[in-house]
Amino acid sequence: MTLWINGDWVTGQGALRVKRNPVSGEVLWQGNDADAAQVGQACRAARAAFPRWARLSFGDRQVRVERFAGLLESNKAELTAIIARETGKPRWEAATEVTAMINKIAISIKAYHVRTGEQRSEMPDGAASLRHRPHGVLAVFGPYNFPGHLPNGHIVPALLAGNTIIFKPSELTPWSGEAVMRLWQQAGLPPGVLNLVQGGRATGQALSALEDLDGLLFTGSANTGYQLHRQLSGQPEKILALEMGGNNPLIIDEVADIDAAVHLTIQSAFVTAGQRCTCARRLFLKSGTQGDAFLARMVAVSQRLTPGTWDDEPQPFIGGLISEQAAQQVVTAWQELEAMGGRTLLAPRLLQAGTSLLTPGIIEMTGVTGVPDEEVFGPLLRVWRYDNFDEAIRMANNTRFGLSCGLVSPEREKFDQLLLGARAGIVNWNKPLTGAASTAPFGGIGASGNHRPSAWYAADYCAWPMASLESDSLTLPATLNPGLDFSDEVVR
């Protein structure tokens, strides 16, 4: 039984799904998808649970959420192993994901009060008050690259605000989704407040098509995000939050320490085997001898990155991709770029057939026209050379996406210029593109999102504002508007 609906574990009535370790092929999890009827059942359970959950005090909801944080802490080793084995990422990185989940709780509680708490302003004849109210039943679609942390970034603030939820993990990480759900069960959430439905496209379409849904919170590919946007068009009553990745630029200008710049670039492009939505996909490198030296060093260090299994010792920097198919898609993308005229500096290699262990790739595309503006979700970095900084900014902005952008330079003036010219929701200076803080908003513009950033701003899309003018008494104004007559004279 792998679905959690209305406080009970039930067996899915849809197709059988089997999840294997992407490197070893070991079967980790199997269960049946939720069919459309079970998705509807989960929605009805969430709707029935909503009034009571929403009417609890914030403190009562906070107690349950903080109990979940404690369970994450006490089960950290077990959840780390599940995430690492299912995604293929190394143990160290899965552990940082669980830590981020724990830290998200306190941050979300603080953000609720700062972003969507209550305010009162005194007026001469009363007061103006601001309160926030939950939307109702929300669907949360989770991604596979951070199957614990990223859904957590929607679920926690949504529950704190008083919403009830139907959670669909990625079909590529059902085990992680179930493991997290079992911790929520132990935290003592009332039946129906949080429901789990497993499945792929059919389950997702059934969930997003529900009429009795108040909103949908999504993290994933641009293609799926656009499909959801089209599906919910003409339904302004439903809140829709989309985080859809990017084709992110990193600009390398003058550098004092080449190794430090190479380290930042590797952290930006290849961490999580290139499977972060903020990963650098396009590297813009200043022409000249220093740029040449940087590129040579970047290739030399990158070719030492050998992917390993989740439990290898010593631990590798990167593990496998989510699947062999995902790894092959990166290889295919590199081959297509090479066929267009790209100059391969480091060829990506599948270490072993039948696995997802893929070494990083670097290809220079300077002077090549018609390069697709698409996110290649893996360890493949494309390089362009530029002559002046204005040109670098123009090249960086030459994308329909707008998630993250970064600059390596000792000059604050150039960063200020980039801040004015960049079209991205995250713009970093001498920090990896993959670096982000939950105490700041996380999201992009263009094809990277729909102006509903998460992290610190997640509270904004989890509740709607209610403004009130209030007075504890009613008296006739001393001065009346023209044309109003409240005298005792009888009009004849």
Swiss-Prot record:
One Pfam short name: Aldedh
Highest taxon, organism lineage: Bacteria
CDD domains in alphabetical order: ALDH_SGSD_AstD (cd07095)
The keyword Oxidoreductase is assigned to this record: yes
Name of the gene: astD
UniProt cross-references to InterPro entries, sorted A to Z: Ald_DH/histidinol_DH, Ald_DH_C, Ald_DH_CS_CYS, Ald_DH_CS_GLU, Ald_DH_N, Aldehyde_DH_dom, SuccinylGlu_semiald_DH_AstD
Protein name: N-succinylglutamate 5-semialdehyde dehydrogenase
Enzyme nomenclature, EC number: 1.2.1.71
Role: Catalyzes the NAD-dependent reduction of succinylglutamate semialdehyde into succinylglutamate.
Active site: E243, C277
Pathway this chain belongs to: Amino-acid degradation; L-arginine degradation via AST pathway; L-glutamate and succinate from L-arginine: step 4/5
Entry binding sites for NAD(+): G220, S221, A222, N223, T224, G225
Record-stated family: Belongs to the aldehyde dehydrogenase family. AstD subfamily.
Keywords: Arginine metabolism, NAD, Oxidoreductase
GO terms for biological process, alphabetical: arginine catabolic process to glutamate; arginine catabolic process to succinate
Species per Swiss-Prot/TrEMBL record: Escherichia coli O6:H1 (strain CFT073 / ATCC 700928 / UPEC)
